[in-house]
Amino acid sequence: MFKFFWRCYFLSSNDLDKLTVNELKEIAKDLEIKGVYKYKKNELIEEIKKVSPMHIEKNGVVLREKIVPKSGKSKPEGINIEENSNRVESFQGDKIEDRRKEQDNNKQEENKREKLREMINESDTAKGVLEIIENNNYGFLRGKNYLTGPDDIYVSPSQIRRFNLQTGDEVEGKVRTPKEGEKFKALLYVQKVNGENPEKAVRRRPFENLTPIYPQERIKLENSSSDLSSRLMDIISPIGKGQRGIVVAPPKAGKTTLLKKIAQSISINHPDMKLIVLLIDERPEEVTDMQRSINGEVIYSTFDEEPEHHTKVAYMVLERAKRMVEQGQNVVILLDSLTRLARAYNLTINPTGRTLSGGLDPGALIMPKKFFGAARNIEEGGSLTILATALVETGSRMDDMIFEEFKGTGNMEVHLNRKLQERRIFPAIDIYRSGTRKENLLLSEKEYEASFNIRRLLYDENNTQNVTEQLINMLCKTKNNDEFVEVISKIDLSKEKNR
């Protein structure tokens, strides 16, 4: 400090001019001048003159105070006592002022928190399926059919990042009414994600990083003695959790009815599984019938909608299913139909410049294959089962091409036979062509032997219709599949036929 006073008392303007820039900066720092590095030499000199209390300029003459040694009686360093006390008082005053400001800020923050708590408590609770807008960070909670509507709820980018939210998440929370100039309600507070604690969504693994394995746990379809189609499928083409199945059917063979019965069986026998029925390009009356017949979620896009509508609905359903599987849930999607979904993509994609037989663009199969290929059993827990219908014998070369492309992608197939349907033999399941890969993982030893015997008989007889009719008659005479398997193991079907 003495160095500082010494410099200021004994340096005139000429003396300052003689100093280097670095020396001037040191003096400026002692005088507590801020931002000394941004000034040039002349500017530094001016700033030092402004704040230096050690000189008085009068008529252009600088009057400097000289330091004169005083007698011993005088107080040592008496000049600085009053100045130091003033500085202490000033410092204490500044400290008190800072403390007051801090308290005021804390009160304001507390008031804001209190207002936010009141707003959250008074707000309505709502939920919806999140759709994150592409090329943007924000999203909306969709309602009916996972599509845009007037009751959508805005979700901010900060909430999406905080809870690692993705398209397809079902978010539940408190919402506020739209402010002036806003169109949609806004999400204030996230309470649940996919029905669970939001913190669980933060730590989840992406669907693509989960390990797919063969289905090992069976989805039992049999629920009554009169439901013959479900009982026959349990023996001939069993379904496991994580199955990727395709129902191949000509028109009017009963594919929609078969899907409906499968949906009813799953909702009865496996109420813990999440069931979604996706109807693409279907008739409106079939949508109503399906909604009234099953206990599950029915998402639809009828044939009078645009192809873009079909593809958007399918995309949202797939993302919704993936998010549930990531949290360890077992999900079943029943799609009717895969053929019409591929047709919709054929109309909406950018043309690749190549065309397959029937006018099918190869690029139109990319998204339907992603949809169908998402079905898998997860080693870490959870599964996504997809059963999709494919149309054949429609007279359209495109439909045949679509089926051929998906023919080897599934691990379970059920073929419906038009000739059986014409003979009024229901269910019209072609036993010879239907089956499941690795069925031994799903069937018991007795059931596997019964299935093997039936197929061997079909090969020997080479008459699918007669053998199918015999099997259906035997199913009608037995109360359940256990009894049916016992009968199959004891009776030679070829002798039964000759009677």
Please give the residue ranges for each predicted region.
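P-loop NTPase catalytic core
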Residues: 262-266, 272-499
